[in-house]
Amino acid sequence: MNQLLREVLTPDAERTQNFTVGDTVKVHYKIVESGKERVQIYEGVVISVANEANGKTFTVRRVSYDVGVERIFPLFSPRIAKIELIRKGKVRRAKLYYLRNLAGKAARIKELKGGKALVSEDRKRQQAAAATKSTTTE
C-alpha cells in the first residue's frame, strides 16, 4: 500500500518543500463552491512542519481582525495550487507554538540575513518551473 501511495503522490520539483518553520508564505489553495473553482490565498507564518514523506503537513498562522487563525495544509495536496515564499525567518525552534500567547510586536519574527536573496532565488526557480511546465503542456 505504501508503495502505491508513493507512486501516486510523487513530489513534483515545484512542490518540494522550499520553506522552513518561521518563514512567511502565501498558500494558493483551490476551493470548490457549488461547482465553481476559485483560488484563495492564505498568508501567514509557518509555525510547524509535521510528519515525513507523502503525508507531510505544515501549519500556517496569521492574525485576522485581532484573532489568531491557524490552518493545517497537506504539502502534497492536489488542492494547493502553489506555495509562495515571502520572507525567511530567523528562529531557533522546530515548533513556534509560543506565538499563540504573544500579541502585536512581540509576535514578530526577525528576518534571516541574506533571506531576501533566498526569496528572490526561490521565485526565479518557481518561474522557471512554471515556464517548463507550460512548454511541455503545449
From Swiss-Prot:
Coiled coil: none annotated. The keyword Repeat does not apply. GO terms for biological process: translation. Signal peptide: none annotated. GO terms for cellular component: cytosolic large ribosomal subunit. InterPro entries: Ribosomal_bL19 (IPR001857), Ribosomal_bL19_CS (IPR018257), Ribosomal_bL19_sf (IPR038657), Translation_prot_SH3-like_sf (IPR008991). Pfam families: Ribosomal_L19 (PF01245). One of its GO terms (molecular function) is structural constituent of ribosome. SUPFAM superfamilies: Translation proteins SH3-like domain. Keywords: Ribonucleoprotein, Ribosomal protein. NCBIfam families: rplS_bact (TIGR01024). This protein is located at the 30S-50S ribosomal subunit interface and may play a role in the structure and function of the aminoacyl-tRNA binding site. Belongs to the bacterial ribosomal protein bL19 family. This is Large ribosomal subunit protein bL19. It comes from Leptospira interrogans serogroup Icterohaemorrhagiae serovar Lai (strain 56601).
